[in-house]
Regions:
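Helix-centered, glycine/charged polyanion-binding patches within enzymatic domains
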Residues: 87, 92-158
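Short, solvent-exposed polar/charged micro-motifs at secondary-structure junctions
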Residues: 11-17, 122-124, 163
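Polybasic low-complexity intrinsically disordered regions
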Residues: 1-92, 96-105
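A general structural signal for well-ordered alpha-helical segments in protein cores
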Residues: 73-76, 136, 140, 166
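Hydrophobic (often cysteine-bearing) scaffold residues that line and stabilize catalytic clefts
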Residues: 72, 132, 161, 165
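Structural motif
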Residues: 42-43, 154-164
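Charge-dense polyanion-binding interfaces
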Residues: 27-35, 162-171
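Anion-binding and metal-coordination hotspots
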Residues: 89, 101-107, 165-193
Length: 193
């Protein structure tokens, strides 16, 4: 099987209000939001990071929310307990030889990432891999545009987590409606027409 992994920033409030934000401060500090940096948008933000793993068809198989300051590579430690004997394709945020070796030795998971230009043993990116990876980017775009996943008015951490889970569930239901009606799974905007 082949899967694609990526992450998306979920902003809780603006960076200037980050120190005054009360979300996650009352209870478990391990779930409190944190400051992070999004390399693709070249911005700092205060909140969480949504990690998702999807298949070739575009259905999300696994997801997790972590603090914004946590590196993308840490999500792969959770994946190795759930999946085995598969290939996972990620972006440059998932480069790490020790993690790739650990995933392969423990669960026979091949983690494929494009090389950085200044990396030793550089090889060009395999074009079909780059085209297929657009699937998870499309899912994140659909979550942002049609389900407004980045706009959240939750006051507590559990409320935010529940809203994110609800939006991912709604996306999956619309994909299933398209599957039943023999329509392309990715066209969720017109699923109920």
């Amino acid at each position: 099987e082949q899967f694609f992994v990526d992450s998306k920033p979920i902003e809780v409030c603006r960076v200037a209000r980050g120190k005054r934000c009360k979300m996650g401060r009352a209870g478990n500090f391990s779930q409190a939001p944190d400051f992070g940096f999004c390399a693709s948008q070249n911005t700092y933000y205060f909140g969480y990071k949504l990690h998702a793993l999807c298949g070739l068809s575009g259905v999300i198989h696994s997801y997790d929310l972590s603090k914004a300051s946590v590196a993308d590579l840490h999500y792969m430690k959770d994946v190795k307990h759930t999946y085995h004997d598969c290939s996972i394709y990620g972006d440059k945020g998932y480069i790490g030889a020790d993690v790739q070796l650990d995933l392969f030795e423990t669960a026979h998971i091949r983690l494929e990432c494009p090389y950085r230009l200044n990396q030793k043993d550089w090889k060009p990116t395999f074009i079909p891999f780059a085209k297929a990876r657009k699937r998870i980017e499309t899912i994140f775009s659909q979550l942002t545009d049609q389900f407004l996943v980045i706009r959240n008015y939750a006051k507590i951490t559990n409320g935010l987590f529940a809203r994110i889970i609800g939006k991912i569930s709604a996306l999956t239901i619309l994909q299933y409606v398209n599957f039943i009606n023999d329509k392309p799974i990715g066209r969720i905007k017109y699923a109920l027409n």
